[in-house]
């Protein structure tokens, strides 16, 4: 079975994914907090410790336009350990792009490999040249969509802190919580 970015349990040697980390008593507290932080970051914050980006808004299913119900996609949580970060235990939520039918361009323009090679060659061939890179935090989360997309997440995948703060028991339908994606 293939998996993306599982977390290694050093004691057992097993690779664990998000749902396994939440069920394992040894890992549950740490990774539940990481999951709450990610959902809070995507929404309107959580517990005063994480600011939200207003990327998603939890909604009632009936708020989804009828003609868009067929486009509701899923969310996948990816766990990883990034030892170089201040908070190394990371959960990232990704939407199932195979179910999104967004009418506008969703591509990310990038430079051609040949252009990059020419550019780097120019840098290393120039005396006293300097080179820098930058990482833009939450770059994609801050790009507004012209029309919202919709998704759903299993209630069992949502940490209690998020469920309580956003009153998701009131919005859940048959074990699912729906959300609107604005960015």
Predicted regions and their residues:
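Long, low-complexity, charge-biased intrinsically disordered regions
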Residues: 1-183
């Amino acid at each position: 079975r293939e998996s993306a970015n599982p977390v290694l349990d050093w004691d057992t040697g097993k690779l664990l994914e998000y749902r396994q980390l939440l069920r394992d008593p040894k890992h549950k507290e740490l990774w539940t907090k990481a999951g709450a932080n990610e959902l809070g970051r995507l929404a309107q914050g959580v517990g005063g410790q994480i600011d939200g980006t207003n990327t998603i808004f939890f909604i009632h299913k009936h708020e989804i336009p009828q003609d868009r119900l067929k486009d509701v996609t899923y969310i996948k949580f990816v766990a990883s350990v990034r030892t170089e970060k201040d908070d190394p235990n990371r959960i990232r939520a990704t939407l199932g792009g195979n179910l999104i039918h967004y009418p506008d361009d969703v591509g990310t323009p990038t430079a051609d490999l040949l252009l990059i090679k020419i550019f780097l060659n120019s840098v290393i061939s120039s005396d006293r040249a300097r080179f820098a890179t930058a990482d833009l935090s939450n770059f994609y989360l801050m790009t507004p969509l012209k029309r919202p997309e919709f998704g759903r997440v299993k209630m069992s995948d949502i940490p209690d802190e998020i469920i309580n703060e956003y009153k998701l028991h009131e919005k859940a339908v048959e074990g699912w919580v729906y959300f609107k994606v604005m960015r």
